């Protein structure tokens, strides 16, 4: 009977755990839809800024912004690492951290030091344990990322590159593909390559141009900063959508596993109960036969 009592306790414990994971699955599903909406809403802004910057670059080929110039000979690179603040989202953070660690090693083999910016508590903890140099950080973004919270940390990297102190700036995050699939991405943020502006932006390479106030150079300077900030914001939005998707899938798997465990425990309980009843009947029959 002690075994049956222990099994009943385990069943109750797993049932309570399943209630929690089921609730977390439903919450993650709701947050995932909102995160996807924010992610999709951010894309047109970044694309429009890119299109305007592409037009201005063609119209003013003599001007090269520092973001578009390679800092050759510099032995330090920058890395913006985007992770989540919370766990329970499967291998999402593990994958991007593993890829980032590999990138760190590649840069070190090339004689490059790395100065990192952490967006998200998991990445910050990883960088501190790894012994990386963290020059700026943003944590506790919540479920809704705001650009004003990101600008300060990102600007640290942009300023260092503009001053010629970084050879390149890389951006590591998780790209949202669909609910069941997310991709780890490490891409070069700076210097901006011609590929950023060569894509068809819907504007013809014509002889006409806008009138810029105060002047074209000032507009380009401001526009490219906004463009890079938009790329980082888009990465954070993609990462948050990936986080909620991964958490929903992980919690669903946990709920399904809990259901399986409950069934197995219930079967063990029934076997123990049947064995106890059989034993009692045997004792009764044995006692009657003795009489």
Swiss-Prot record:
UniProt keyword list: ATP synthesis, Cell inner membrane, Cell membrane, CF(1), Hydrogen ion transport, Ion transport, Membrane, Transport
Native organism: Burkholderia mallei (strain ATCC 23344)
InterPro entries with a match to the protein in the record: ATP_synth_F1_ATPase_gsu, ATP_synth_F1_gsu, ATP_synth_F1_gsu_CS
Protein name: ATP synthase gamma chain
Compartment(s) of residence: Cell inner membrane
Annotated function: Produces ATP from ADP in the presence of a proton gradient across the membrane. The gamma chain is believed to be important in regulating ATPase activity and the flow of protons through the CF(0) complex.
Gene this chain is encoded by: atpG
GO molecular function: ATP binding; proton-transporting ATP synthase activity, rotational mechanism
Chief location bin: membrane
Family: Belongs to the ATPase gamma chain family.
Superkingdom of origin organism: Bacteria
């Amino acid at each position: 009977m002690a075994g049956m009592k222990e099994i009943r306790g385990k069943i109750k414990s797993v049932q309570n755990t399943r209630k929690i994971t089921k609730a977390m699955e439903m919450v993650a599903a709701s947050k995932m839809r909102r995160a996807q909406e924010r992610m999709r809403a951010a894309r047109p802004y970044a694309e429009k800024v890119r299109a305007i910057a592409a037009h201005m670059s063609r119209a003013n080929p003599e001007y090269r912004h520092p973001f578009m110039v390679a800092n050759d000979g510099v032995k330090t690179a920058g890395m913006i690492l985007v992770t989540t603040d919370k766990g329970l989202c499967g291998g999402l953070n593990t994958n991007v951290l593993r890829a980032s660690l590999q990138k760190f090693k590649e840069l070190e083999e090339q004689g490059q030091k790395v100065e990192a910016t952490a967006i998200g508590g998991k990445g910050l903890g990883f960088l501190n344990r790894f012994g990386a140099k963290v020059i700026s950080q943003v944590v506790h973004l919540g479920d809704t990322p705001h650009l004003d919270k990101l600008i300060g940390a990102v600007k640290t990297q942009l300023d260092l590159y503009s001053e010629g102190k970084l050879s390149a700036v890389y951006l590591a995050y998780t790209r949202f593909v669909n609910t069941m699939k997310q991709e780890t991405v490490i891409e070069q943020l700076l210097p901006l390559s011609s590929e950023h502006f060569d894509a068809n932006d819907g504007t013809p390479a014509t002889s006409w141009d806008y009138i810029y106030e105060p002047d074209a150079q000032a507009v380009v300077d401001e526009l490219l900063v906004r463009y890079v900030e938009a790329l980082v914001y888009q990465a954070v939005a993609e990462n948050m959508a990936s986080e909620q998707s991964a958490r929903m899938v992980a919690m669903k798997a946990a709920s399904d596993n809990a259901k399986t465990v409950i069934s197995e425990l219930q079967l063990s309980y029934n076997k123990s109960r049947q064995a106890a009843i059989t034993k009692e009947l045997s004792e009764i029959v044995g006692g009657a036969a003795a009489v």
